[in-house]
A protein has these predicted regions:
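A short glycine-rich, Lys/Arg-flanked "PGG" loop and its adjoining helix->strand segment in the class I
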Residues: 154-169
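Class I SAM-dependent methyltransferase SAM/SAH-binding core
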Residues: 64-68, 72-128
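Core SAM-dependent methyltransferase catalytic element
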Residues: 254-275
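Conserved catalytic loop of SAM-dependent methyltransferase domains
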Residues: 31-38, 212-243
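Acceptor-substrate binding/catalytic loop of class I
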Residues: 188-205
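Conserved class I S-adenosyl-L-methionine
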Residues: 2-61, 74, 169-193
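A conserved beta-strand element that flanks and buttresses the S-adenosyl-L-methionine
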Residues: 142
Length: 275
């Protein structure tokens, strides 16, 4: 993609997420309230139960985390709640406003002292990333369901690598090309209609992307088939659709590994050996 086209696309993407921040409708209470914030988080982790396991929020207590594409801040809050020092950024200013209000509300609760452990940035990660407030770079760069929405994900990953400690971890989620969602259904219940850019990757393509950015891939796992009946889901009711309601759980979990929509990628910035 040419530079001029990339700039236009970035502006289009920014406008899209400003007008409909991701997951903002996960809550039924008035947007911005504490009740709404709790509803958003509960629904997010209910329908994507693999996310907290993948992020392993408690693992990063006292560690420095860079979150690329924080959206409305659900995972940001979870990292903070478990003691991480978080720099969170997003292209969407409207999304960041919600993240700021949520961290402000939760930051009132002792003993977390969140205000001293959170920084928010309205930036395009292709162009600029913050430096760690501490020394030596970030312990974790985390991005869940974001990089497939940017024109140049390789550039973002290379930028991120330059801000990380040697041996630090990268944990990202990318959409899978060969999934139940893409092969057998036109409905995208968790995604938002009209998204201007949403790439999908094979396992090999995802591995190649991460390795081209200078990381060593440790694991790539496929997961997540959306089992809920859409007409109930949009009304915040959770009724499983056919065939998911009749499948034994072990069979469903096996299918997720084969036809899941989410590629969960763990990698590290290699330690550079000196002569």
């Amino acid at each position: 993609m040419r530079q001029a086209d990339e700039t236009t696309m970035i502006e289009t993407i920014e406008k899209y997420w400003d007008t409909q921040p991701c997951n903002v409708k996960h809550g039924t209470a008035p947007v911005g309230t504490k009740e709404w914030s709790e509803q958003v988080r509960n629904r997010k982790y209910l329908v994507e139960p693999h996310l907290p396991l993948f992020a392993n929020f408690a693992m990063w207590n006292g560690k420095s985390v860079l979150e690329i594409g924080c959206g409305i801040g659900t995972d940001t809050l979870s990292f903070l709640e478990h003691g991480a020092i978080v720099d969170a950024l997003d292209l969407s200013e409207e999304s960041l406003k919600l993240t700021a209000s949520r961290t402000e509300e939760y930051g009132k609760k002792a003993p977390y002292q969140w205000r001293s452990r959170a920084r928010l940035f309205h930036v395009n990660a292709e162009d600029w990333l913050p430096g760690n407030a501490g020394k030596g770079g970030y312990d974790l760069v985390y991005s869940f369901g974001v990089l497939h929405h940017t024109p140049n994900p390789l550039k973002v990953l290379r930028n991120a690598r330059s801000k990380m400690k040697q041996g630090a971890e990268l944990r990202i989620m990318l959409y899978a090309k060969y999934s139940w969602k893409n092969l057998f259904t036109r409905q995208q219940p968790e995604a938002q209609g009209g998204c201007p850019l949403a790439r999908k990757y094979t396992v090999k393509e995802a591995r190649d992307l991460v390795e081209m950015a200078g990381f060593k891939v440790e694991s790539i796992e496929k997961t997540h088939i959306f089992p809920w009946r859409i007409k109930d889901y949009i009304q915040h009711r959770y009724v499983k659709a056919w065939p998911w309601k009749i499948l034994p759980k072990p069979v469903f979990l096996w299918l997720e590994k084969v036809l899941g929509w989410h590629l969960l990628i763990k990698a590290v910035r290699p330690v550079e050996r000196t002569a």
